[in-house]
Amino acid sequence: MQKAVVMDEQAIRRALTRIAHEIIERNKGIDGCVLVGIKTRGIYLARRLAERIEQIEGASVPVGELDITLYRDDLTVKTDDHEPLVKGTNVPFPVTERNVILVDDVLFTGRTVRAAMDAVMDLGRPARIQLAVLVDRGHRELPIRADFVGKNVPTSRSELIVVELSEVDGIDQVSIHEK
């Protein structure tokens, strides 16, 4: 049951524009930076951030796609043969000595981000890993903090944050739902 819309299309657009500016400022430009979106919605957010960064800086930043299914400690498994579901990683550039900015839709327990960091480290040794999220809802189980946050949305554990993006869902909005 949906309780409230906490970000509409305009709020998401403004948050991503602000995050793009913060990424550029904190990294003193975009030289050596790469964006890696965490499947599924993190990929679309990473692409949108790359577009905004290019509009601001006049230079493109590479975007990769990361599937962290095999790195999760709470794997999603198929019921028939108990094989982990793998969707595929596509990071077509080296990450070694690069500033890797992981992009995800919601930061909750930190487990997805930990798995994403493991996956990135398997690809090489980045100079630094930063984290950009559209929504930080709290309730961390691991010592992980986002470097760039679109909106902090305090929630109870009985609530869900639902991020809908036009590329997948036909609408841009973030809402809170009861479990």
UniProtKB/Swiss-Prot annotation:
BP GO annotations? DNA-templated transcription termination
Task: Give the first-level EC class, as a single word.
Answer: transferase
Top-rank taxon of the source lineage equals: Bacteria
The family database entries (Gene3D superfamilies) matched by this protein are listed as: 3.40.50.2020
The listed location of motif PRPP-binding is: 100-112
| Complex formation | Homodimer and homohexamer; in equilibrium.
Q: Which family does it belong to?
A: Belongs to the purine/pyrimidine phosphoribosyltransferase family. PyrR subfamily.
Q: What is this protein called?
A: Bifunctional protein PyrR
Which organism was this protein described from?
A: Bacillus caldolyticus
Q: Which gene encodes it?
A: pyrR
